[in-house]
C-alpha cells in the first residue's frame, strides 16, 4: 500500500500552489524540461494511449511565432515566461498503441470510430497537461495554464502538415509572487460533490 505524501508535498502540489502571471528572470534548462516529461509521462491515460505531444518554446524566435495567436490578456505573461509549452494531441495517437498497449488490437478501437479517437485524444491530453503542471510543481517550478489563444493559428504555425492539434498553453518558470492576485475561492465539497 502506498504511503501518503508529506504535508509539505501537499502544499507544494495543491494548497499553496498558484497560477502565475509574472516571472523571475531565472532560466529553465532543457534538462529540467526533460525531467518534467520524465515525471508526467507516468500519469495514467486510457489504454495507455498517451496522446499528448508537447512543444516547449524557450526562445525569442519561438515566442514571436506564437505571439499572433495570443489573446491580449495572455500576451505579456507569455512573452516574459521562460518557457511556454504547447500541449497538443496527436489525432493518430492510436498508431502507437501496438507499442504502448500490446495486450490486444487496441488500435482498431479507434480506427473504426474517428469520433471516439478525437474524444479520447482530447480528454487524455488534457489529463496529461495536468500531470505536466504537477510535475513542474514537484520540481519547484510554477505554471500558468491558458486556453485563451487562437488554436487554428497555432496549428497552422507549429503543426502544419502533421497529425497534431493544439489543446492548451502552459507558461513555465519561477513565478514572481509579488505579481500574484489575491487567491480566489474554490467550491466546497458540498457544492461540487455527491455521495451515493
UniProtKB/Swiss-Prot annotation:
Cofactors required: FMN
Q: Which PANTHER family match?
A: MALONIC SEMIALDEHYDE REDUCTASE RUTE-RELATED
Q: What is the name attached to this protein's record?
A: Probable malonic semialdehyde reductase RutE
Identify the keywords attached in UniProt to this record, alphabetized.
Answer: Flavoprotein, FMN, NAD, NADP, Oxidoreductase
Gene that encodes the chain: rutE
Task: Report the catalytic activity.
Answer: 3-hydroxypropanoate + NADP(+) = 3-oxopropanoate + NADPH + H(+)
The cysteines joined by S-S bonds are none
Query: What induces or represses expression of this protein, per its UniProt record?
Result: Up-regulated by the nitrogen regulatory protein C (NtrC also called GlnG) and repressed by RutR.
Query: Which class of enzymes does this protein belong to?
Result: oxidoreductase
One Gene Ontology term of the molecular function aspect = 3-hydroxypropionate dehydrogenase (NADP+) activity
Q: Which InterPro entries match?
A: Nitroreductase, Nitroreductase-like, Nitroreductase_HadB/RutE, RutE-like
Q: Which family does it belong to?
A: Belongs to the nitroreductase family. HadB/RutE subfamily.
Q: Which Gene3D superfamilies match?
A: NADH Oxidase
- What does the entry give for GO biological process? nitrogen utilization; uracil catabolic process
Amino acid at each position: 500500500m502506498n504511503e501518503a505524501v508529506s504535508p509539505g508535498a501537499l502544499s507544494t502540489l495543491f494548497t499553496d500552489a498558484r497560477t502565475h502571471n509574472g516571472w523571475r528572470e531565472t532560466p529553465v534548462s532543457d534538462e529540467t524540461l526533460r525531467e518534467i516529461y520524465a515525471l508526467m509521462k507516468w500519469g495514467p491515460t486510457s489504454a495507455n494511449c498517451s496522446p499528448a505531444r508537447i512543444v516547449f518554446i524557450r526562445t525569442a524566435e519561438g515566442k514571436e511565432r506564437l505571439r499572433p495567436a495570443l489573446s491580449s490578456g495572455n500576451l505579456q505573461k507569455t512573452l516574459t515566461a521562460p518557457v511556454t509549452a504547447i500541449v497538443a494531441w496527436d489525432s493518430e495517437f492510436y498508431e502507437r498503441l501496438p507499442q504502448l498497449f500490446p495486450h490486444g488490437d487496441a488500435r482498431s478501437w479507434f480506427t473504426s470510430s474517428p469520433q471516439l479517437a478525437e474524444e479520447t485524444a482530447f480528454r487524455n491530453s488534457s489529463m496529461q497537461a495536468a500531470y505536466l503542471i504537477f510535475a513542474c510543481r514537484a520540481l519547484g517550478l510554477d505554471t500558468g495554464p491558458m486556453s485563451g489563444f487562437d488554436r487554428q493559428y497555432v496549428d497552422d504555425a507549429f503543426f502544419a502538415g502533421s497529425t497534431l492539434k493544439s489543446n492548451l498553453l502552459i507558461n513555465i518558470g519561477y513565478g514572481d509572487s509579488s505579481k500574484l492576485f489575491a487567491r480566489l475561492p474554490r467550491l466546497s465539497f458540498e457544492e461540487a460533490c455527491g455521495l451515493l
